[in-house]
Structures are given as structure tokens and as C-alpha cells.
């Protein structure tokens, strides 16, 4: 096969390749078998017309497009292999020559994977982070657990304070007219939680059960409902009940309520300390990894094709839709609730996608620069891990992974990250 690759502007180039007559004949034969099944020709049973009769009635050229559709995936794949290019998008294929009895000549406009110009990626300075759990961190966690065990107790003849939970009716009015979605009865609200627009909860502080009040507010300019954004409104409220948190003492009894596997507060503290220490070490390691990768990416230069960003954004959108589905929502409902559009969401996803694409390209380039290749032992170990995780046999995992290209790529990137981490300097 004759193949010619001409690099053009950016990451786009022109690939010229041929389909020789022997291959063309094979494609025409396969196309005829496919087309013949659908033909009704007088004098012949459906699907039984001879090739010679077909050519006489319709001409062999009638098979050219079907033959090309059959041959193109195979010959294009062979052409890009021979040219040594790595396409990142579906090509635009053009027919240059398709004459009877001659070699077919095709060209394709191909967007290829960009070259990465690496900057410094070894010996990068990163922040030195404390990994030891502090007394304050342990006490904060214990306080949270203590608060979760708190009971709400009705406050008698006392004003509402931040942290209290109030039961109230409210109705919102704009220009004296009640607006949609601005009313509720016997609504439970924790003051200071920030559930309502700024100012609403603050103006409930100091009221007592049975009090009624008019609360004058202005909706934020960025509020999702356009008819209310930046508009002055009045909420008529009536407090029915005020409840305050009654926090239990931090003692052995509470420790047993929090974790039935412990008998004393000291045992609970020890167990929580171990969990928090492990979590902190993991968090510090993750932060270090993110920082060193970000610096290596910042130091690199790469012209990213928009096609790669667009595909990655599509991938993120699909994941987003799956996450919504797991919560019992659809994208349409989400857009309705938030006032956002699918186009705006995709544009937002493209910003994240561009960062992810550049990061992966840079890490792949580092792996190549370091001549990183996963060993058979590492591949087998990863397959064992996946088999255990998904409850599958190793052979089944191997079959599902096919040529292992994705697994090998993942392992190479992990090793590239190790290169960054091992050489990083904490300061």
C-alpha cells in the first residue's frame, strides 16, 4: 500500500493512501453479496441474480460506494499504522480517484495526537505538609460526633438563636403578589444553615414561638429564577416552635452509643485517632500528587486539538448523567431545577476536559521520556486486583481487557506519577 502523510497547520494533516486492484476486487465481491440479497430482477429469484447480469443492468460502478464502506476501516487502519500517526478524531475522507480497473486513491484530513514539549518535571518543589494528627483535629471530630447524638428539645418562652431549629410558616410576596415557590407550612429550618437566601435566617434570630413578622429582603443578583434575581421581596412568617440542641456529655456511655464495638471513651478516641491518621496521610499524599502533577503540566507546552477536548467533555457529560440517574434524576430535571442549559453545562465541562486532556498527554510524554513499560508481573498483579475487585476469574478479566492497551497505558501513567513524586522536593 502506498501511503503519504503531509503535516499541515497545527495537529491536522493530509493522509494519502491507495486501495490496490486486488483489494478493490475483494471489496466489490463482498459488496455484491450484500447487495444481491435485496435485489428483485425480473427472471430471477430475489437474491439470486448473477454478477454478470447485475453489471449489465446496473454497472459495476453501482457497487463502488458499498465496496468502499466495507474496505475503508481496514485500509485506513493499515494506512495510519504505516504512516506512524495517532488520530484523535474521525477523519474526513475524500475520493481522489476511483476508476474502473485502476488503483483507488483516497485522502483523509486527520487530526493527530499532539506532540508535548516537556519542561522541568523532576525535582519539583512541593509544599511540606504535616501528616501527624493534632489534638485539635481529634477534638473537632469528637465534637462533631457528640453533636450528631444531640436531641432537639423545645425551648419554652425563649428567643431563637443561631443553631436552633424553628418550625415556621412563610409566604413570599413581590410587589404585593405571592410568587411561585415562595411559601411553605410547618417548615423545619436550622438557623445559620444557609438554606435560605442571605438575610432570611438572620432576621428570624430573636423571635419567639407564636411571633409573626414581615421580613424584607432582596434576592441575590445571580439567583437562578430571572424574575426574582435582584428583586426586593417581603416574606410573611409565623414561628410555631423553637427547638434547641441538647448535646450529651462526652463520656463512656456516649462512646458506646457512637460505636457499639467500644466500651470506653478512651477506646473510641484510639479508634478514631487511627482512622483520622490514615485519612490525613492519604489526604496529604493526594495533595502532594496533585501539586507535583499540576507543576509538571504547567511547565509543559502542548497544542491541544479541540476534538480531544470535545470528546473528553462528552465523556464527562455521560458520567454526569449516570451520577444523576443514580440519584433518581435526569439531566432534563437537573437543568429545570438549576436553570442551567445543556450547552452551558457542556461549556463548563470543556474547561475541566481541557485540563484533564493536557494532564494525560503530559504524563504519557513523561512515561515515554522515561522509557516506562509495564512488566508482565505488574500487568498480572493488576489483573489479579481487578479479578478480586469484581469477583471474576483472571482469564475472564484478560478476555475483557482484550489487547491490554488501556491497562498498559494506565500502568505507564501511574509509573510516570511515581517518577514525579519520588523526585519531588518538599519545602
UniProtKB/Swiss-Prot annotation:
NCBIfam families given in the database record: tig
Top-rank taxon, per record: Bacteria
Described function: Involved in protein export. Acts as a chaperone by maintaining the newly synthesized protein in an open conformation. Functions as a peptidyl-prolyl cis-trans isomerase.
EC primary class: isomerase
GO biological process: 'de novo' cotranslational protein folding; cell division; chaperone-mediated protein folding; protein transport; protein unfolding
Protein name: Trigger factor
Domain PPIase FKBP-type intervals: 163-248
Catalytic activity: [protein]-peptidylproline (omega=180) = [protein]-peptidylproline (omega=0)
EC number annotated for this UniProt entry: 5.2.1.8
Amino acid at each position: 500500500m502506498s501511503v503519504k502523510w503531509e503535516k499541515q497547520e497545527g495537529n491536522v494533516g493530509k493522509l494519502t493512501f491507495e486501495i490496490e486492484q486486488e483489494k478493490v476486487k475483494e471489496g466489490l465481491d463482498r459488496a455484491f453479496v450484500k447487495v444481491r440479497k435485496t435485489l428483485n430482477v425480473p427472471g430471477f429469484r430475489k437474491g439470486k441474480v448473477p454478477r454478470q447480469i447485475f453489471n449489465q443492468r446496473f454497472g459495476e460502478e453501482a457497487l463502488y460506494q458499498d465496496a468502499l464502506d466495507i474496505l475503508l476501516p481496514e485500509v485506513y487502519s493499515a494506512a495510519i499504522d504505516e504512516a506512524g500517526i495517532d488520530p484523535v478524531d474521525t477523519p474526513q475522507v475524500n475520493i481522489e480517484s476511483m476508476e474502473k480497473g485502476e488503483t483507488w486513491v483516497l485522502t483523509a484530513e486527520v487530526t493527530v495526537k499532539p506532540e508535548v514539549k516537556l519542561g522541568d518535571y523532576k525535582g519539583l518543589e512541593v509544599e511540606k505538609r504535616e501528616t501527624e494528627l493534632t489534638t485539635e483535629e481529634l477534638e473537632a471530630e469528637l465534637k462533631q460526633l457528640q453533636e450528631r447524638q444531640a436531641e432537639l428539645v423545645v425551648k419554652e418562652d425563649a428567643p431563637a438563636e443561631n443553631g436552633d431549629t424553628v418550625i415556621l410558616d412563610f409566604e413570599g410576596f413581590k410587589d404585593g403578589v405571592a410568587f411561585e415557590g415562595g411559601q411553605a407550612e410547618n417548615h423545619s429550618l436550622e438557623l445559620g444553615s444557609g438554606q435560605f437566601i442571605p438575610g432570611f435566617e438572620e432576621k428570624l434570630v430573636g423571635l419567639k414561638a407564636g411571633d409573626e413578622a414581615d421580613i424584607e429582603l432582596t434576592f441575590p443578583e445571580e439567583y437562578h429564577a430571572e424574575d426574582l434575581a435582584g428583586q426586593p421581596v417581603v416574606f410573611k412568617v409565623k414561628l410555631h416552635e423553637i427547638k434547641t440542641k441538647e448535646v450529651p456529655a462526652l463520656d463512656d456511655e456516649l462512646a458506646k452509643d457512637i460505636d457499639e464495638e467500644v466500651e470506653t471513651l478512651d477506646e473510641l478516641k484510639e479508634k478514631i485517632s487511627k482512622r483520622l491518621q490514615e485519612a490525613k496521610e492519604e489526604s496529604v499524599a493526594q495533595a502532594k500528587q496533585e501539586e507535583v502533577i499540576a507543576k509538571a503540566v504547567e511547565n509543559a507546552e502542548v497544542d491541544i486539538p479541540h476534538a480531544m477536548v470535545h470528546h473528553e467533555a462528552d465523556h464527562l457529560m455521560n458520567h454526569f448523567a449516570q451520577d444523576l440517574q443514580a440519584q433518581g434524576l435526569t439531566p432534563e430535571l437537573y437543568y429545570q431545577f438549576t436553570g442551567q442549559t445543556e450547552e452551558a453545562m457542556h461549556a463548563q465541562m470543556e474547561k475541566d476536559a481541557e485540563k484533564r486532556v493536557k494532564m494525560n498527554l503530559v504524563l504519557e510524554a513523561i512515561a515515554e521520556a522515561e522509557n516506562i513499560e509495564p512488566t508482565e508481573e505488574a500487568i498480572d498483579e493488576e489483573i489479579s486486583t481487578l479479578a478480586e475487585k469484581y469477583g471474576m476469574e483472571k482469564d475472564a478479566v484478560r478476555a475483557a481487557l482484550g489487547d491490554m492497551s488501556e491497562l498498559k497505558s494506565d500502568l505507564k501513567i501511574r509509573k510516570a506519577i511515581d517518577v514525579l513524586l519520588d523526585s519531588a522536593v518538599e519545602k
